[in-house]
């Protein structure tokens, strides 16, 4: 079944480039940039990938991202991910990147963007993988900081297809960012946002009504609100669900408890994605395979999930 799932044409719509930084590349970049790491070796770092919640993961994620310093680093990060896409027949990807993770530590916005954009261009030309880049604001920072990031992005408007919202969800509702999303949409950006991962269904309502998003990233807690579920079904609002991430971060205690197939059978346009694959134990095919192994996902369901991902593309 794994090989069949791997060969299925699919799109990935929820992937953080910084979260695809495999330990081997992390150590290589640290050596290239002469950065001392707190882990003795690759296996010690892998051993640290045991998280009880989103925040524990984010603490390690930001620490790991510190090795990314130059255009070449960001190119190598993105290119390594695109090679994974090619190997798993991901024919289209819409990755996120978090400029604030880098600008806050003194890396120029253009350095980050140039490296990523060149790799995506090469991915189109050499690997045949189409793509669109999503600029994501960090919700644990202020809206003023997000506004500054949007200012930095506007001279490169054509490099992005959308703006998003990620990082620590609890205590940082979508309403906190209404003004910057209003402004981004007025500049022609499509909006997406993480909502309903650890946060309550109310956060999904806010993301839809205040941020006017076209796609919900995660959204698994929507199932707790019947009226919200009906709206998502009626309006066919896509959900970019990340099963391995959800179990690794204890949103669900075990994959057998995941609700993605329940949502699929109710008519929700759910998709399968890897989120931060270097940290969560798998890329897109591994996520599909986990659904087959633990939830008995059928070939028909897998085809529908893959088709949903292709239908839910922004570009």
Swiss-Prot record:
Keywords: Hydrolase, Metal-binding, Nucleotide metabolism, Zinc. It comes from the Bacteria. The keyword Metal-binding applies. GO terms for cellular component: cytosol. Binds 1 zinc ion per subunit. GO terms for biological process: adenine catabolic process; hypoxanthine salvage; nucleotide metabolic process. It catalyses: adenine + H2O + H(+) = hypoxanthine + NH4(+). The record marks 218 as: Important for catalytic activity. The keyword Hydrolase applies. Zn(2+) binds at residues 14, 16, 194, 275. Substrate binds at residue 276. The active site is at residue 197. GO terms for molecular function: adenine deaminase activity; zinc ion binding. Signal peptide: none annotated. Its cofactor is Zn(2+). It holds the Pfam family A_deaminase. Its EC number is 3.5.4.2. Catalyzes the hydrolytic deamination of adenine to hypoxanthine. Plays an important role in the purine salvage pathway and in nitrogen catabolism. Belongs to the metallo-dependent hydrolases superfamily. Adenosine and AMP deaminases family. Adenine deaminase type 2 subfamily. This is Adenine deaminase. It comes from Pseudomonas putida (strain ATCC 47054 / DSM 6125 / CFBP 8728 / NCIMB 11950 / KT2440).
